[in-house]
């Protein structure tokens, strides 16, 4: 498939986790155009993909916050800023554009930017492969969280007991889908609010919950389950199988970044060996084994301001204090 040339942007952030979102905020706050490429179907990185319901206690000034709530706050902070969030795009190639900038290739597009900030964490979090007999016979089998808005009036079978499955089931129901949620073990995991909404829907016969239940095979019409030893056919227009994610760094490790194992060496500004390419968060060698949100946020602010100055040399390196500037954007 021929890649489509996306509109140019000044700064491209690879990774929509907390570090990437904060870097996007700071660069856009300085008045630059920013695009974020996120491999999954939603931003949030590890916080949403792996532990959305865990409580975080070491965000400065915030005694405690759920991971999903922190992601929501980071997105809200983007406000009216010029940030283009692109989900479902895995960065695969990096090449110079001949003018001092860079071109990043994904499966379907080419993105040109004056500077790049790598915030890819453990790598692209890709959904585990669906390995169910008959998976190739059903017309719509998915392994990642979809946008619920497009499923009104559809019958959706959600398979999985992870928090993402319970959240997806509730969001799909609220979007107007007819939902069946199933898991091979008894019970489901999720934050108390989501589980309460799940139970309310079950009691009101708005959603069918089947657990424990074994998914035997998929069919063109839906799925065949075994519930309490008895076969059960479930009709479904869409089958959503959520079995977690696997990190994949392999595309980025082909880039000439002088890799040190799973880390990218960086200087005090976050810049790598490539001019205009910066690294922050879990990928940055300077952070060592301190995989902390507080450190990632600091790296994001430093790299974003250096990248802003790199793209627009007339901008001061230091942005000043937000309390003195106020509003959007800071130039």
From Swiss-Prot:
Annotated FAD binding sites: 38, 46, 51, 91, 125, 282, 323
PANTHER family xrefs: THIOREDOXIN REDUCTASE 1-RELATED-RELATED
Family according to the record: Belongs to the ferredoxin--NADP reductase type 2 family.
Cofactor, free-text remark: Binds 1 FAD per subunit.
Keyword terms of this UniProt record: FAD, Flavoprotein, NADP, Oxidoreductase
Catalytic reaction list: 2 reduced [2Fe-2S]-[ferredoxin] + NADP(+) + H(+) = 2 oxidized [2Fe-2S]-[ferredoxin] + NADPH
Subunit note: Homodimer.
Name of the protein in question: Ferredoxin--NADP reductase
Enzyme Commission numbers on file: 1.18.1.2
Cofactor(s) it depends on: FAD
Annotated InterPro entries: FAD/NAD-bd_sf (IPR036188), FAD/NAD-binding_dom (IPR023753), Fd--NADP_Rdtase_type_2 (IPR022890), Ferredoxin-NADP_redctase_2 (IPR050097)
One Pfam family cited in the UniProt record for this chain: Pyr_redox_2
SUPFAM superfamilies named among the record's database cross-references: FAD/NAD(P)-binding domain
Alphabetized GO MF terms: ferredoxin-NADP+ reductase activity; flavin adenine dinucleotide binding; NADP binding
């Amino acid at each position: 498939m021929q890649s489509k040339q996306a509109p140019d942007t000044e700064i491209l952030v690879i990774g929509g986790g907390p570090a990437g979102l904060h870097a996007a905020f700071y660069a856009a706050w300085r008045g630059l155009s920013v695009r974020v490429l996120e491999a999954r179907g939603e931003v949030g990185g590890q916080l949403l993909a792996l532990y959305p319901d865990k409580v975080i206690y070491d965000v400065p000034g915030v005694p405690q916050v759920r991971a999903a709530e922190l992601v929501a706050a980071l997105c809200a902070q983007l406000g009216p800023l010029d940030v283009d969030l692109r989900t479902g795009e895995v960065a695969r190639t990096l090449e110079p554009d001949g003018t001092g900038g860079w071109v990043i290739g994904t499966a379907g597009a080419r993105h040109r930017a004056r500077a790049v900030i790598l915030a890819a964490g453990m790598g692209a979090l890709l959904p585990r492969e669906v390995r169910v007999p008959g998976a190739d016979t059903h017309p719509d089998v998915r392994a990642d969280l979809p946008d619920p808005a497009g499923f009104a009036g559809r019958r959706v079978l959600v398979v999985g007991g992870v928090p993402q499955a319970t959240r997806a089931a509730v969001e799909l129901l609220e979007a107007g889908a007819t939902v069946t949620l199933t898991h091979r073990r008894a019970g489901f995991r999720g934050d108390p609010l989501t589980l309460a909404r799940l139970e309310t829907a079950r009691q009101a016969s708005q959603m069918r919950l089947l657990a424990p239940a074994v998914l035997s095979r998929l069919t063109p019409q839906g799925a065949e389950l075994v519930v309490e030893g008895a076969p059960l056919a479930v009709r479904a227009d869409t089958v959503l199988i959520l079995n977690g994610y696997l990190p994949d760094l392999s595309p980025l490790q082909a880039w000439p970044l002088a890799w040190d194992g799973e880390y990218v060496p960086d200087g005090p500004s976050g810049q790598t060996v490539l001019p205009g390419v910066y690294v922050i968060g879990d990928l940055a060698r300077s952070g060592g084994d301190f995989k902390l949100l507080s450190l990632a946020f600091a790296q994001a602010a430093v790299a974003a301001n250096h990248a802003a100055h790199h793209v627009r040399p007339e901008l001061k390196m230091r942005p000043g204090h937000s309390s003195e500037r106020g509003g959007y954007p800071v130039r």
